[in-house]
């Protein structure tokens, strides 16, 4: 196998040097590989469970810290617990509910919470008078026509089936 090498071709245009001198900036140029990278600094959260606290369904003062106003179990992110602690707390809460130490849901607070949430989302409600008598009359007359046509069709079917 013989591979022919082609000669290096020179370009016909001459190489132009830049007339502006190259100035190095005082700050080094930083090239970020991932611009929105999350910082990986170690963090230590203080647990809401003390070293002497027993996670048990009878320890109501401890359990009540990990339940929301509506009676729901709060998430690990909110509780700032380890996985093992969260599992034990969840089991204790469920046992307390079954043994009727805790309600399954706190309906009084839940109703208040829902009312507040709805008012925040929708804002104040203003009723507008949108009643236009001409349009409602037109709509009702169309509805009456449709109903009468439907009745006629049903009568025709009944007559044809009788024969």
Swiss-Prot record:
It is found in: Plastid, Chloroplast. The keyword Chloroplast applies. PROSITE patterns: RIBOSOMAL_S18. One of its GO terms (cellular component) is mitochondrial small ribosomal subunit. InterPro entries: Ribosomal_bS18 (IPR001648), Ribosomal_bS18_CS (IPR018275), Ribosomal_bS18_sf (IPR036870). It comes from the Eukaryota. Residues 7-48 have a biased composition (Basic residues). Residues 1-52, 144-163 are annotated as: Disordered. One of its GO terms (biological process) is translation. Pfam families: Ribosomal_S18. Keywords: Chloroplast, Plastid, Ribonucleoprotein, Ribosomal protein, RNA-binding, rRNA-binding. Part of the 30S ribosomal subunit. NCBIfam families: S18. HAMAP family: Ribosomal_bS18. Belongs to the bacterial ribosomal protein bS18 family. PANTHER family: 30S RIBOSOMAL PROTEIN S18, SMALL RIBOSOMAL SUBUNIT PROTEIN BS18M. This is Small ribosomal subunit protein bS18c. The gene is rps18.
């Amino acid at each position: 196998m013989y591979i022919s090498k082609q000669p290096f071709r020179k370009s016909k245009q001459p190489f132009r040097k830049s007339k502006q001198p190259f100035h190095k900036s005082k700050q080094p140029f930083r090239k970020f590989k991932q611009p929105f990278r999350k910082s990986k600094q170690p963090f230590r959260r203080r647990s809401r469970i003390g070293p002497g606290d027993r996670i048990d369904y009878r320890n109501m003062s401890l359990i009540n810290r990990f339940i929301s106003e509506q009676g729901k179990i709060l998430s690990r992110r909110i509780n700032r617990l380890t996985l093992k602690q969260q599992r034990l707390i969840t089991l204790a809460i469920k046992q307390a509910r079954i043994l009727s130490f805790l309600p399954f849901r706190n309906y009084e607070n839940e109703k208040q919470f829902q009312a507040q949430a709805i008012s925040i989302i929708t804002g104040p409600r203003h009723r507008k008078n949108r009643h236009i008598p001409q349009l409602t009359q037109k709509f009702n007359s169309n509805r009456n026509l449709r109903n009468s046509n439907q009745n006629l069709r049903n009568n025709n079917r009944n007559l044809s089936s009788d024969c």
